[in-house]
Amino acid sequence: MNIALELAKKGEGFTSPNPMVGAVIVKNGHITGKGYHKAAGKAHAEVNAIDEAGDDAKDSTLYVTLEPCNHTGRTPPCTEKIISAGIKEVFVAMEDPNPDVAGGGIEFLRSKGIKVSTGACLKDAERLNEAFIKYVKTKRPFVTVKCASTLDGQIATATGDSKWITCGKSREFVHRLRHASDGIMVGINTVVKDNPSLTTRIEGLNGSDPVRIILDTDLLISEKARVLQINSNSDIMIISGLSVSQEKKALIEKTGAKVIESKVYDKKFIDLDYLMDLLGAEGITSLLIEGGGSVISSAFSAGIVDKICFFYAPKIMRGNNGVSICRGSGVLLMKDCINVHNIKIKRFDDDVMIEGYIK
């Protein structure tokens, strides 16, 4: 099953809105077939593994990271392929999290005399598809907040300078986070100060660009901003308030961007909880927030954050006039802090990344 999980990871960034799935076929103690789901609309992992195994699939054992589908979508049911191949036993890491189909594939295989066991490497399988699991249950994206700061919690100097806080290896990993995400979100201040492209750049990999999402209540973005001019196959969404200039909206949409008018509160802040429903309806299953201190603070306040990836560089900025990770007023009592769970720590040269979960 561990081999199947590693295979599944090869589909990262390409399978959405489908999950990442890997499959391995074993006969007489030898692997005869391996496969993974390469992209949405392409053959599922089980089919690829069975095709590779050929005649050796008969009387074999299948290891698969997600319950085989039992319905016709963009591809035929995998259960039918498993049955026709003559596979005698199936090990499934996790059931399909979709409440409308959960358990159906397993029960169908059992009804045909195939032995099915579940739960092997369950936690690893759930972690692999954490975004897919949340989306099929809530129709809202799985939200990860990423930031890079000094040891004293500053993400930029008083002048706005932030290039570069972290090392090259840390920044490369961030691009892998972008590749794995359906959408990336920043605020208009980041666009104005940094003029980013918000694309994915990974050496040796044709990475997927996430949908670029910019919070811009008053539609202040320039039509000449790099994010609107750079060549990319991904969409751009500008999230504005409800009373923006229609002339400016038309000007921005001429660049190919889509302006989405959203609810605001206090006359200037996008309602992020409401926005998650809008993004879910647009098919965004996973969202990476790379915004500045105001956007990050708003995301935590709105309760939309599922996961954090905080990078710390061995630098101390000194003073309190820089830009902190979170802006605005914080809690008054330590007991009211947001707790982070299931912590993992990774090293990138001298940088440290803390990964953890909010919910």
Question: Residue locations for each model-derived region?
Answer:
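Proteins enriched for Cys/Gly/acidic motifs involved in redox and nucleic-acid/cofactor modification
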Residues: G13-T15, I106, A120-A148
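Zn2+-dependent cytidine deaminase-like catalytic core
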Residues: I25-D124, V211, M237, V244, ...
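Generic structural signal for helix capping and beta-alpha/helix-loop junctions
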Residues: P99-D100, E126, F269, I296
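Short beta-strand scaffold segments in enzyme catalytic cores
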Residues: M20-G29, C147-A148, I354
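A broad detector of the eukaryotic-type serine/threonine protein kinase catalytic domain
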Residues: K9, I87, V92-E95, I114, ...
